[in-house]
Amino acid sequence: LFSRVALSFGENGKFSHLPNDQRWARVKAGESDPGLDALFFQYARYLLISSSRPNSPLPVALQGFFNDNLACHMGWTNDYHLDINTEQNYWIANVGNLPECHLPLFDYIKDLSVHGSKIAQDLYGCKGWTAHTTSNPWGYAAVSGSILWGLFPTASSWITSHVWTQYEYTQDKNFLKETAYPLLKSNAEFLLDYMVTDPRNNYLSLIHISEPTRPY
């Protein structure tokens, strides 16, 4: 898997004799080091390869599996944050030519959509499925935490965009039929039920949501 991709900006080895902390300090000071960019690209691929493979029981979480109980004492307890963190873990999957490393995330989204269908109906009276800012290994899909950042029913749409990205890169028609389209269709049904028509312009608009990063 790792050998599938080579990335060079022409000067990859120019500063390779330096420790990485010194290279990083040079870049922060305004110096150029294209090789460090290539190194970080490959490091991201390495992290995903080492933590997310076909048949992995779960996708990559905030801290990974090896926390020595530390995660239990953190505010986010090594969960799944669907507002950006989980997505960021998988941004490298397709651009890094690692489509099979994406698969544990899709298995998780399918499970999440089952729980999210009940939340869509019970909480919003809507068809389809939804999920909010935080989730866990059991597919938790309801609102949690502060309403300032927890009431984010479009988190499901954000995480589901990954199935479309996978299809765009792979053009796998069977994946589109069996996995991507059902998830996208059901989530779109939720959005169509959830949105309201703005009388000022007749556009469909979202009812109040709390976008988690807005306060920052």
Identify the meaning behind each predicted range.
Residues F40, L82, P199:
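Extracellular/periplasmic catalytic domains that process cell-envelope and extracellular macromolecules
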Residues G75-V196:
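Aromatic-rich carbohydrate-recognition surfaces in CAZymes
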Residues F66, A131, L206:
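Short clusters of hydrophobic/aromatic residues that line enzyme substrate/ligand-binding pockets
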Residues D198-L206:
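Flexible glycine/proline-rich, aromatic-decorated loop/lid segments
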Residues Q42-Y43, S146, R200:
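Short, well-ordered loop/turn elements at secondary-structure boundaries
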Residues L1-D79, L98-I119:
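Acidic/polar, glycine-enriched structural segments that form the non-catalytic walls/loops
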Residues I207-Y216:
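Single conserved hydrophobic/aromatic residue that forms the stacking wall/gate
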Residues R45, I49-R53, Q63-N67, A71, ...:
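An acidic- and aromatic-residue-enriched active-site/binding cleft used to recognize and process polar
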